[in-house]
């Protein structure tokens, strides 16, 4: 935690800021609290504001959204906690005024810079009305960048989260039964990680007949469709260890081996994963990872989901989305994006997800990794092979 605060205060000094105002929400199973969590260790079930002064001798304050959440927040937070009230921006303004920053410069850290999710409009209006001479600078993207390289302690937490995620993935393959509705699989996934001491984060899945596929990515909402012999279940699963998450993608084949078309798609994904894992090393640029995955395009597939993304508590750079398909088949002479270079100890999800051009068939094969000198180290123990369920 001392390292994190040091990095945050260095950011404030670079921008001549007297404090940061950090906003979080409970979206995505509390993982939209990532920026607040990083400086407090608290994952709130509602909204939060952290007022983080630049001066190390001045106490920060975490304002939680609901009064009855204050006692629990005080048990987990490493900074003092107060209720933000029904006008939390007024509480933030009062704190800034007490710090002598009513006419100063503060940095705003929102939820997610990629999608422009900052503090709510009404809160911002209230803050401006209370402190009309306050200068607010958005530093969300730069702050999120501080979290990209993981500490030794964070990597240890990610290993635990990966093991919890493996437990959930294994439970799907072992417990799925013919006639079971999809939504029961969600209970299996979340129940397995909960029983092992984890928290649910992501449980996306889609079941369909191997010989009549009708979807290329796992669904965010399980249906009441009943599992049948000869089905494939495509998955994306993350379980968390107090904020830090693993992520795994494996297809599960029910009561039958993969058909030739599914086997070919799986083998393409596996080859792409291996090449990408070798390319994801310190100093690697985005174009090198796109080139490593070009086997997907060379075999007539595209992708739908991200090819890789930074991870840990939430998704952050580096991110390579489906626009990379425009560079396949690979041509060394054609310009390709550079993007942020990969750094040692970044946590990155590698997830080749080949889909057919008509987007009726697809699978994901991936894992959370940590960047090391020799390439990406997979944190998961589930084999890179089709999972067979007896059904």
Predicted regions and their residues:
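Active-site neighborhoods and metal-handling regions in enzymes and metal-associated proteins
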Residues: 1-391
